[in-house]
Amino acid sequence: MLLVLRDIKEDFLVNILDMSNQSSWLFARIDTIVTLVILGIFALFAFFRNNIKALLWLMTLVIAGCLTMTYVSFFYETLNLPPITWLFIQSLSLYIAYLTFQTIFFDRFIACFRIKGNVGFFIAMIDFIGYLGTVTLLSTKEFLNIELEWFALFNHISCTVGAICSILFIIAGLLIYRKYTQEMK
């Protein structure tokens, strides 16, 4: 679900926000700042020696990203954020959730449970499922000839995906912790 949302943001950002009066480099600058913030956060995980602690903190990071995404989407009208601020917060929360889960989460998961293998299978499987969702959305739009209001769609999907992923990652975090404590007995 996070991959579908990321694809929509990246592929249809010009349709989501009308920034015709802004520099064409604005999107790149926002994503550069987001990337640097996330790299800084990820660098801190090099100091975690305990894999279960790192894994649970990564889950917390994903949940925080999802909850922020949900909050900003659900209360968009109330918050009355400027489009650039809204885009920055949405990008940061989406990429924190997506990149955390898509990258270092699987490394720590494999290390925590001493699974023989590498992250390639997990990442390929998640990518396949995500791209299948994107293709389904775009095919439905094209074949049913649906006109979309991209901003409303993105905000609605962000709210829904953020809420669902928050719940699922909370459950997953509890299950991972329980499994880890059972294996350590």
Specify the residue positions occupied by each region the protein language model found:
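Transmembrane alpha-helices of Major Facilitator/SLC transporters
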Residues: 4, 24-51, 65-69
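Alpha-helical transmembrane segments of polytopic membrane proteins
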Residues: 25-36, 88-94, 152-167
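Intracellular juxtamembrane helix-capping segments at the cytosolic ends
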Residues: 96-114
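A late C-terminal transmembrane helix in Major Facilitator Superfamily
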Residues: 109-145
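Extracytoplasmic gate region of multi-pass secondary transporters
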Residues: 1-24
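Juxtamembrane "helix-exit" motif on the non-cytosolic side of transmembrane helices
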Residues: 12, 16, 71-80, 139-147
